[in-house]
Design a protein with these regions (language model features):
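Substrate-binding cleft of secreted/luminal carbohydrate-active enzymes
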Residues: 1-22, 257, 261-396
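Chitinase-like catalytic core of GlcNAc-active glycosidases
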Residues: 38-242
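Short carbohydrate-recognition loop motifs
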Residues: 395-424, 478-483, 583
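Extra-cytoplasmic beta-strand recognition segments
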Residues: 413, 417, 425-455, 492-495, ...
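Solvent-exposed loop/turn segments flanking beta-strands in beta-repeat/beta-sandwich domains
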Residues: 450-452, 564-586, 607-608
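Extracellular carbohydrate recognition and processing domains
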Residues: 464-503
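Conserved aromatic anchor
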Residues: 552-570
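Beta-strand-rich modules
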Residues: 597-631
């Protein structure tokens, strides 16, 4: 079972560039919460997500918008790339797009080591082989797991030993294996989460607790073994209280214990004893971990991106869809009402085109450059963490991420409804240092009558949780339908020189419509930067077709290039690949944060002799480099 892992080396891996995450883990900060119940520094949230069946996870996105495009990173501390099976493989490393999106938002991602129950094809020999020492007394599989995580760029392993039939000697060897895994990985920032299954007898006996039978996999006499423990679903209020107390006695944090919350089949209708985990009064008892929150997509009959994000917003924010105004307490305790959100928007330049990482089309500068559906989380923007804080003295409009039009990527922020009073929509929580040259830019459009748009910049935080954000408002002008020509989009700019030397803590927009008219207004992009943008990023180097197969006028090919050098804006944010058509037009084929992309089923255009491809580097402000070209010849 472990032969392929034992023999793996990055030097011999032909798929390495396709599977390697490149975005470093961003630092996070915690703004003042928008409500009085969310707490900072207490319970945390882990999320165990199956993005696709084990063998069905694409390396770099796929041609469908029907995908669990998670965007509520602000509430998550750790994401487990859930999967593994006896028939498909029991070690599952996360794909690069998920890791890149998570890291951009400061979230760690763990791969999964799954030793399945015998009833699901498990074999105790696999467990024994996993924890076997070599002739020098080392654990070679532990060393390889660390090597894989470091090479592919993710953050550690979730270890789930559910194959029954072991004994205490096997349990001891498992604990020693975890220690070796930790010793090899900790210097590189890697983490271990242990699932509450195997106990110190070597048998599988889910405790629903941290207790004397399983604590040695978390903390033994020599110190820390695992960083966190995922406490099985069998927990009770009493066992969680006892678990937290034991963690305290061991000198560890009770918030390193994830109480399992099963949302796979019922989502927000799940029967959860919330007060046993995160009581409204008193300290949080432990943290919690969602099992399969992708229910927000899987339960839908309408699997469109818009329907998914509406459901996902309700799951994370609550029924009110406004974290500053939580709905009356019901059976579902939304994370936004429990855990303080976090952000990574702490440096210039910053830009967001409200791209969720999937879409029905691909847009560039307001024009469609591909009409094919797609997903790739590595292309996702850092989106506002609070969906959506809306302030108005009149009727509340609809505020959504919408996929019918976009400035760049696949989506935009849509505000629609009758504006009977000015409407403020909170956007990003930030820590942006402002200078005399700082400017804020909005790319926006209206499909209705004229509106006045102002941008809000808060140079201090609210005085307490639940208090309003104190914005300073800057006028950007008025716009009406068609004001920007063919695409309907226009760019508005406001100088931030009056705020120089201060820090921007939050950004917002305020929209006013004359006479309370119905409004359809889109925000396509938001950016804050210093000074004029005149220099493009450096182009990628040496693009090449590494392999190709041709059949019936189509080609399946592997494309690669060398990383562009760091330009004036630093390393590229990502790369984009286009097809150059015989008439000179361009069609978007895909993007990646890495330096390789698989292109399936590229059709021949007429009788062209070769398909020409362009690769461009894209920086943090979405400026694009000059193209680097390569071509694939068609057979006569």
């Amino acid at each position: 079972m472990w032969r392929s892992l034992s023999r793996w080396s990055p030097e011999d891996d032909p798929d390495l560039a396709h599977n390697t995450a490149t975005v470093p883990l961003a630092e996070r900060f915690t703004p003042v919460p928008p409500n009085r119940t969310a707490r900072a520094g207490r319970a945390r949230i882990a999320s165990l997500v199956s993005f696709a069946p084990t063998a069905g996870n694409p390396a770099q996105g796929s041609p469908t918008a029907d995908y669990y495009a998670l965007t509520h990173w602000a509430y998550i501390d750790e994401l487990v790339f859930w999967g593994g099976s006896a028939g498909e493989g029991i070690v599952l490393a996360p794909n690069a797009p998920v890791v890149d999106a998570a890291h951009r938002n400061g979230v760690r991602v763990l791969g999964n080591v799954f030793l399945p129950p015998v009833a699901y094809g498990g074999d105790l020999r696999w467990t024994r082989d996993l924890v076997r020492r070599d002739s020098l007394g080392r654990f070679p599989i532990a060393e390889q797991l660390v090597r894989v995580a470091r090479t592919y760029g993710f953050d550690g392993w979730f270890v789930n030993a559910e194959t029954d039939g072991g004994d205490s000697a096997l349990a001891t060897r498992m604990r020693e294996f975890l220690r070796a895994l930790r010793a090899a990985g900790e210097p590189h920032g890697l983490r271990i989460t242990w699932y509450d299954a195997m106990n110190s007898t070597g048998r599988v006996g889910w405790q629903g607790a941290l207790n004397a039978l399983n604590q040695e996999f978390y903390e033994d006499r020599a110190g820390k073994v695992a960083d966190t423990v995922f406490v099985d679903f069998r927990w009770t209020p009493d066992t969680l209280v006892a678990s937290g107390a034991l963690a305290d006695r061991l000198g560890r944090s009770r918030h390193e214990l994830w109480a399992a919350v099963d949302t796979e089949s019922r989502g927000w209708d799940a029967d959860v004893r919330w007060d046993a985990i995160v009581p409204r009064s008193g300290d949080h008892v432990v943290s919690y971990g969602f099992y399969r929150p992708e229910w927000t997509r899987n339960h839908l009959t309408d699997r469109s991106p818009g329907a998914f994000h509406h459901a996902d917003d309700r799951f994370w924010t609550g029924e009110s869809l406004d974290p500053a105004r939580p709905a009356p307490e019901g059976s579902w305790r939304a994370p936004a009402t429990v855990v303080a959100d976090r952000s990574t928007v702490a440096g210039l330049p910053f830009a967001c085109s409200f791209n969720t990482g999937h879409g029905l089309r691909w847009y560039e500068n307001g024009r469609v450059t591909s009409d094919a559906p797609w997903n790739h989380l590595g292309l996702q923007d850092r989106l506002p963490g609070r969906r959506w804080v809306v302030d108005t003295a009149g009727a509340r409009p609809s505020v959504t991420l919408d996929f019918a039009d976009a400035w760049r990527g696949g989506s935009s922020l849509l505000v629609s409804g009758s504006l009977t009073a000015p409407v403020t929509v909170g956007l990003h929580s930030t820590r942006l240092p402002l200078t005399r040259g700082s400017v804020v830019e909005l790319v926006h459009a209206t499909g209705s009558g004229p509106v006045t748009v102002e941008v809000g910049v808060a140079t201090r935080e609210p005085s307490a949780p639940g208090e309003p954000v104190p914005y300073t408002w800057l006028r950007t002008g008025s716009t009406g339908a068609g004001a920007a020509g063919a695409t309907g989009w226009r760019t508005a700019r406001a100088a931030l020189a009056p705020l120089a030397g201060r820090t921007a803590y939050a950004l917002a927009v305020r929209i006013t419509a004359p006479g309370g008219t119905a409004v359809v207004w889109r925000l396509g992009a938001l950016s804050v930067h210093d000074g004029a943008r005149t220099r493009r990023p450096a182009p990628p180097l040496a693009p090449a077709v590494d392999a190709a197969a041709r059949q019936d006028g189509r080609a399946w090919l592997r494309l690669s290039w060398r990383a562009a050098g760091s330009g004036p804006g630093g390393r590229p944010r990502h790369y984009e690949v286009h097809r150059v058509l015989p008439d000179g037009g361009r069609r978007f084929l895909g993007g990646t944060c890495g330096t390789a992309l698989y292109l399936p089923g590229v059709p021949r255009a007429g009788r062209e002799r070769a398909a020409v491809f362009e690769v461009r580097a894209v920086d943090e402000l979405y400026a694009v480099s000059a193209p680097a070209r390569t071509a694939l010849s068609w057979e006569p």
